[in-house]
Curated annotation (Swiss-Prot):
GO terms for molecular function: ATP binding; kinase activity; phosphotransferase activity, alcohol group as acceptor. One of its GO terms (biological process) is 1,6-anhydro-N-acetyl-beta-muramic acid catabolic process. Keywords: ATP-binding, Carbohydrate metabolism, Kinase, Nucleotide-binding, Transferase. Its EC number is 2.7.1.170. Pathway: Amino-sugar metabolism; 1,6-anhydro-N-acetylmuramate degradation; Cell wall biogenesis; peptidoglycan recycling. It comes from Neisseria meningitidis serogroup C / serotype 2a (strain ATCC 700532 / DSM 15464 / FAM18). CDD domains: ASKHA_NBD_ANMK. Belongs to the anhydro-N-acetylmuramic acid kinase family. The lineage of its organism: Bacteria, Pseudomonadati, Pseudomonadota, Betaproteobacteria, Neisseriales. Disulfide bonds: none annotated. This is Anhydro-N-acetylmuramic acid kinase. Pfam families: AnmK (PF03702). It comes from the Bacteria. HAMAP family: AnhMurNAc_kinase (MF_01270).
């Protein structure tokens, strides 16, 4: 009988707060479970340099390569900590899947840039490494995002009713899992990104811990309506977005400068919740259960806004109820995609991205 295989997934999302690594166990292409997690926060200097690359500037190519190397050393450190915590050696791992750090996402131009020096990561970890997952989907005419609906479908689908899985990272994305049709999904809009940027600008804090600042504010209805009028929300799916559309400077064009900073933050929380509600209502009105993952689940103000928007129509849950910690889901997805690559299984959710066909995602690097 063939032994089961272990994979590591490493994910650093649009919140740019650090790198998550998750250990999963597979039997060929069959998911058996997640077994461990490690997290390495980004140093402030690294985070600032990554944010600087979001905008055009001098010597971008050199800076991006240097940051790719620094990120890969940090990723290797995170993988090593995970292995140590599980009493494992690199030789115990079949492959490592690394998403990299997105700095540009431009599907309208056929590219999405994730920083990672994958050969260096393979060399540092001594583990076969799979990465550059988005390029293959883009080459097939897709958006290159979101890539997680196929993973959500493999783990979370129910054969009796439509479920949705909501990931709230810097960007929020939804996977819709009908019982009798292919999964689909798309980016609903900003998740934590604008809230984090506003908190950093006005309190010099990385994020609004437990929604404490937002809880002191009131929703500004006129501002909310102006934000909701962005044309992205009226576009049909498949669609994806990022900082290119929803950066702090975009928000500031709608402000007159006299708004209370707590009120703006409170409004941004409702903005995220409302765009999720509108997306589900338009694209998957028969959804009855929604499972939530990502950093946003730790914000009680945002969770209360989601509950108020959905009311009794949709029941909200954590993915922990489906046996996967909400902080582990995205990194686990890229471990799963590495397993798909090894087993030559198409892992692309082409119904979500708009690609012309299912694809085996990623490129592999031996150490």
């Amino acid at each position: 009988m063939m032994e089961t295989q272990l994979y590591i997934g490493i994910m650093s999302g649009t919140s740019m707060d650090g790198a998550d690594a998750v250990l999963i166990r597979m039997d060929g292409g069959k998911w058996l479970g997640a077994e461990g997690h490690a997290f390495t926060p980004y140093p402030d200097r690294l985070r600032r340099q990554l944010l600087d690359l979001q905008d055009t500037g001098a010597d971008e190519l050199h800076r991006s390569r240097i940051l790719s190397q620094e990120l890969s050393r940090l990723y290797a450190q995170t993988a090593a900590e995970l292995l140590c915590s599980q009493n494992l050696a690199p030789s115990d791992i079949t492959a490592l899947g690394c998403h990299g750090q997105t700095v540009r996402h431009a599907p309208e131009h056929g590219y999405s840039i994730q920083l990672a020096d994958l050969p260096l990561l393979a060399e540092r970890t001594r583990i076969f490494t799979v990465g550059d997952f988005r390029s293959r989907d883009l080459a097939a005419g897709g958006q290159g995002a979101p890539l997680v609906p196929a993973f959500h479908e493999a783990l979370f689908r129910d054969n009796r009713e439509t479920r949705a899985v909501l990931n709230i990272g810097g960007i929020a994305n939804i996977s819709v899992l009908p019982p009798d049709a292919p999964a689909f999904g798309f980016d609903t809009g900003p998740g934590n990104m604008l809230m984090d940027a506003w908190t950093q600008a006005h309190w010099q804090l990385p994020y609004d811990k437990n929604g404490a600042k937002a809880a002191q504010g009131n929703i500004l209805p006129q501002l909310l309506d102006r934000l909701l009028a962005h044309p992205y929300f009226a576009r049909p799916h498949p669609k994806s977005t990022g900082r290119e559309l929803f950066a702090l400077n975009w928000l500031e064009t709608y402000l007159d400068g006299g708004e209370n900073r707590y009120d703006v933050l409170r409004t941004l929380s409702r903005f995220t919740a409302q765009t999720v509600f509108d997306a589900v209502s338009h694209a998957a009105a028969d959804t009855r259960q929604m499972y939530i993952c990502g950093g946003g689940i730790r914000n009680p103000v945002l969770m209360a806004d989601l509950a108020e928007c959905f009311g009794t129509r949709v029941s909200l849950h954590s993915t922990a109820e489906l046996n996967l910690d909400p902080q582990w889901v995205e990194a686990a997805a890229f471990a799963w995609l590495a397993a798909c690559w090894i087993n030559r299984i198409p892992g692309s959710p082409h119904k979500a991205t708009g690609a012309s066909k299912p694809c085996i995602l990623g490129a592999g690097y031996y150490y």
